[in-house]
């Protein structure tokens, strides 16, 4: 590698909106803020909601199924 052309790789804190602080390394050089992390994201916390799309499909077919009939 060439000398003096690479950015500094320093340790920073990534702070989530829930208050969780994650220590990581980056070339940004300053602390960053996150919207979601593994502590508050619904997928990781088990609070994920499954949407019932079957009702939407049936409703669509009911409304527009007449146009597809021959």
Curated annotation (Swiss-Prot):
Which InterPro entries does this UniProt record tie to the protein? Ribosomal_bL28/bL31-like_sf, Ribosomal_bL31, Ribosomal_bL31_A, Ribosomal_bL31_sf
Family annotation (Gene3D superfamilies): Ribosomal protein L31
Q: Which PROSITE patterns does the entry link to?
A: RIBOSOMAL_L31 (PS01143)
The protein's matches in Pfam families, at most eight in alphabetical order, are given as: Ribosomal_L31 (PF01197)
Detail which positions bind Zn(2+): 16, 18, 37, 40
Which top-rank group of organisms is this from?
Bacteria
Ordered alphabetically, the record's keywords are:
Metal-binding, Ribonucleoprotein, Ribosomal protein, RNA-binding, rRNA-binding, Zinc
Comment on bound cofactor: Binds 1 zinc ion per subunit.
State what this protein does: Binds the 23S rRNA.
Q: How does it assemble?
A: Part of the 50S ribosomal subunit.
Q: Which family does it belong to?
A: Belongs to the bacterial ribosomal protein bL31 family. Type A subfamily.
Q: What is this protein called?
A: Large ribosomal subunit protein bL31
The organism that produces this protein has a lineage beginning with:
Bacteria, Pseudomonadati, Pseudomonadota, Gammaproteobacteria, Pseudomonadales
Q: Name the gene that codes for it.
A: rpmE
């Amino acid at each position: 590698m060439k000398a003096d052309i690479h950015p500094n790789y320093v340790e920073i804190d990534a702070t989530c909106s829930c208050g969780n602080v994650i220590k990581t390394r980056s070339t940004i050089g300053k602390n960053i803020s996150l919207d979601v992390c593994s502590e508050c994201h619904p997928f990781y916390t088990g609070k994920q909601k499954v949407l019932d799309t079957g009702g939407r499909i049936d409703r669509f077919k009911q409304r527009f199924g007449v146009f597809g009939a021959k």
